[in-house]
Amino acid sequence: MGDILGAVYDLGHRPYLARRTVYEDRLILSTHGNVCRAINLLTHDNRTTLVYHNNTKRIRFRGLLCAYRVPYCGFRALCRVMLCSLPRLCDIPINGSRDFVADPTRLDSSVNELLVSNGLVTHYDRVHNVPIHTDGFEVVDFTTVFRGPGNFLLPNATNFPRSTTTDQVYMVCLVNTVNCVLRFESELVVWVHSGLYAGDVLDVDNNVIQAPDGVDDND
C-alpha cells in the first residue's frame, strides 16, 4: 500500500503525484558469509504502460543489522552493506555477491570492474560494526535518488510515452561471520502522472521530495 504525498503541475499537463511505498524485508546471511538480493523498486502505479514522463525515485533505506551466534554473545561482527544499480540494460548474469566484488570472502574487496564498465553505480558502500546478541543492532540509514524509468540516466525534459524496463537494483552484504541477519525497511517515493490516480491528494513539502524533470515545484 502507498500514500499519496502531494502534487505538482507542469504546463499543459495534469498534475504529477508523489506516491510513497514502504517495504520490509529480512536477509539471513548464509554460512558463506555473503548474500545478494535483487530489489524491485516498482510501485503499483509503475506496472502500467501509462506511466507519463520521467520519474524521480527517492529511496530511503533504514535497516537494522543484527548478528546472532550462540554462545558468542558480546562479540561484534563486521558487515559491509552495498546498494548498487545498473542504470542501463546489462546482459551480464548476476548470481550473487561474488559477481559484485572480486573476492566475496574479503570485506575490503574491490567492486567488479566488468560491471563498473557496463554502468554499475554504487549508491552506498560502508562497513558496519554489529553487536552479536539478540538485543543489539546497528542502524543503516541513507537516502539516494534514481532518475527516469528503469533507472536510466537521461537528460532533463525528456518525455516518455510509456514505461520502460524494471529497475535493476541490488542490496549486497558481506560479513566476516555466519548467522547474521539483516532487517531493513525501504521507503520509496515515485512521481506519477495524475491520470493514474484519482484519490485524495495531501500537501507535501516539494523542496524535500524532488519533482520530475521539467516540473516546476512552485506551480
Curated annotation (Swiss-Prot):
A motif (Nuclear localization signal) lies at residues 57-62. Signal peptide: none annotated. Its main location: host cell. A motif (Nuclear export signal) lies at residues 169-178. Belongs to the benyvirus P25 protein family. Pathogenicity factor implicated in symptom exacerbation. Might function as transcription activator (Potential). This is Protein P25.
